Amino acid sequence: MSARRHIGNPEYLTRRIPQNPRYQHVKSRLDTGNSMTKYIEKLEEIKKNYRYKKDELFKRLKVTTFAQLVIQVASLSDQTLEVTAEEIQRLEDNDSATSEADAEIAAKTNGKGSPEEQSPSPVQFINSTGAGDSSRSTLQSVISGVGELDVDKGLVKKEEPNGKDKPYPDCPFLLLDVRDRDSYQQCHIVGAYSYPIATLSRTMNPYSNDILEYKNAHGKIIILYDEDERLASQAATTMCERGFENLFMLSGGLKVLAQKFPEGLVTGSLPASCQQALPFGSVRKRRGPKMPALPAENKWRFTPEDLKKIECYLEEDQGPADNPSRLNQNNSAGKDSKVAACRGGQNLPTSCPASHSSPRTLTSGHLQGKPWK
């Protein structure tokens, strides 16, 4: 008696569905919690953007951590500048008040005991041997002479650089760009110093004064970066072998920085290797002629607009996908925004015909009334 054959073929259960590369970038809507898909995507991202090696001597600094550090340093520096400006203004006001009081006293007494006597000229002080030739009058002539010589000095004054054009004072980190000089002039992070990796090969003075000042200093760190960790990892390993203990490498370099913070942190035009490519199958928009690459500015501090952009990208990056505990916060924020939107829409006319309601809402309400359907 032959064995009983089952209906269907068991191979159908193991057969894979062919994937269309055109829709490879489309993700499913329902993707919550930890899954194998997310784990594989994370591994692929690490292989693509990072170059982890075993037994790394240096420490790594995430791009998001660096952005938070930049925001804190900029806010503290602005507060310090405001306090310093207030103190300088107060001292200037005190000096002007004292000088006005001295001028009034001198005008009343003419520099002597009686207000009626006329003050002799400086020439009389020096040449005459009369009553005006006293210790006080001679001192006054010297003072007036110095003042006459300093009249022309006030016209020619060297323009002092603005405080905002200089690096942050007492900055806790020293940012070094280890690419070549041309790449640095094309694009770099705001506040970074150019330190090509070839400088480490010098036999005499391979380090600048800033690097020696920050080397193993308490409360200060040195950060190296490049485009894709190729040069920065070599430079960081060499410097750690030479005794640098407070050295960090910006994990991912400019490539990851451009993905997470397209604006705000960088000045100049990003290289082509760091720019994001459009996914396969996506519609490319027609653009005009390509704009020429703008060189990087000599910029040492972040503007308020830059800091706003950095904060926006930080909030966007720190979503519920990274931290599940933030899911409830985002839901509550979404509810608050909906409530605010509803309050804002109270001014609109309330009488809406029933025909304007979408069929989706009607069917959803119908199903809520009958859960078994």
Swiss-Prot record:
Omega-N-methylarginine, modified sites: 343
Q: Which cysteines are joined by disulfide bonds?
A: none
Q: What is its main location?
A: cytoplasm
Q: Which residues carry this modification: Phosphothreonine?
A: 109
- Extract the SUPFAM superfamilies matched here: Rhodanese/Cell cycle control phosphatase
InterPro entries documented for this protein: CEP41, Rhodanese-like_dom, Rhodanese-like_dom_sf
Q: Where is this region: Disordered?
A: 91-137, 317-373
Family matches, as SMART domains? RHOD
Which Pfam families has this protein been placed in? Rhodanese
Sorted keywords for this record are: Cell projection, Ciliopathy, Cilium, Cilium biogenesis/degradation, Cytoplasm, Cytoskeleton, Methylation, Phosphoprotein, Protein transport, Transport
| A GO biological process held by the record | protein polyglutamylation
GO cellular component labels: centriole; centrosome; ciliary basal body; cilium; cytoplasm
Q: Rhodanese domain location, by residue?
A: 169-266
Cellular location of this protein? Cytoplasm, Cytoskeleton, Microtubule organizing center, Centrosome; Cell projection, Cilium; Cytoplasm, Cytoskeleton, Cilium basal body
What the record says about disrupting the gene is: At 10-13 dpc, embryos show a range of phenotypes, such as malformed hindbrain, exencephaly, brain hemorrhage, dilated pericardial sac and lethality. For an unclear reason, some homozygous mutants develop normally, suggesting presence of extragenic phenotypic modifiers.
Q: Which domain of life is it from?
A: Eukaryota
- Start-end of Polar residues biased regions: 116-137, 325-334, 347-366
Query: Which residues are modified to Phosphoserine?
Result: 96, 99, 114, 121
**Does this UniProt record's set of keywords contain Protein biosynthesis?**
no
Q: Which family does it belong to?
A: Belongs to the CEP41 family.
Task: State its role.
Answer: Required during ciliogenesis for tubulin glutamylation in cilium. Probably acts by participating in the transport of TTLL6, a tubulin polyglutamylase, between the basal body and the cilium.
Q: How does it assemble?
A: Found in a complex with TTLL6.
Under the heading PANTHER family, the entry gives: CENTROSOMAL PROTEIN OF 41 KDA
Q: What is this protein called?
A: Centrosomal protein of 41 kDa
Source organism of the structure: Mus musculus
Gene name, Swiss-Prot/TrEMBL: Cep41
